Amino acid sequence: MYMQVETRTSTRLHLKRAPGIRSWSLLVGILSTGLAAAYYSGDSLGWKLFYVTGCLFVAVQNLEDWEEAIFNKSTGKVILKTFSLYKKLLTLLRAGHDQVVVLLKDIQDVNVEEEKVRYFGKGYMVVLRFATGFSHPLTQSAVMGRRSDVEAIAKLITSFLELHRLESPSERSQSSDSEPDGPGGQS
């Protein structure tokens, strides 16, 4: 799942994302490797601690972030929050929370973009496009697998923000060509 809807009202849309099963499995696998190396080695206690802490460090580094997106029409802002356990441990609890605040009126479009994920193939993410030409992803990492989950979140945001795409001139001409001719237009 890309993001879960925490709350949805006419003025507020709150989306959340937590590390997925793949991320937690990787954490358990790497950490158990360190524990097994420490348990089965004949090394001193210092080396055993090094094995465990080294693998814990690598495991936490590979853990995905917790992410939130809060769209609030009453304040006119969207708040994108990210919490990283790795940054929290690395900076000794001083950092780990990143936050981006943007005005809702600046959002022009919501798109789904494809991103290449090293070793695994393709991933998808929602990208917010702003009036300034700047774009920002809704989450920091792409989700693997079904594009439909990501498209559903993009449609939810688009409908909440009431962003309706205007037809381009070429789309208008194509739709008028496909319409049946009126009674006076037949030859």
From Swiss-Prot:
Modified residues (Phosphoserine): S168, S170
Protein name: Cytochrome b-245 chaperone 1
Gene: Cybc1
Membrane topology designation: Single-pass membrane protein
Function according to Swiss-Prot or TrEMBL: Functions as a chaperone necessary for a stable expression of the CYBA and CYBB subunits of the cytochrome b-245 heterodimer. Controls the phagocyte respiratory burst and is essential for innate immunity.
Principal location class: endoplasmic reticulum
Residues annotated as transmembrane: 20-42
Subcellular location: Endoplasmic reticulum membrane
Region ranges (Disordered): 167-187
GO cellular component, one term: endoplasmic reticulum
GO BP of this protein: innate immune response; respiratory burst after phagocytosis
InterPro entries linked to this entry: Cybc1
Known partners and oligomeric status: Interacts with CYBB; CYBC1 may act as a chaperone stabilizing Cytochrome b-245 heterodimer.
Alphabetic keyword roster: Chaperone, Endoplasmic reticulum, Immunity, Innate immunity, Membrane, Phosphoprotein, Transmembrane, Transmembrane helix
Similarity comment: family membership: Belongs to the CYBC1 family.
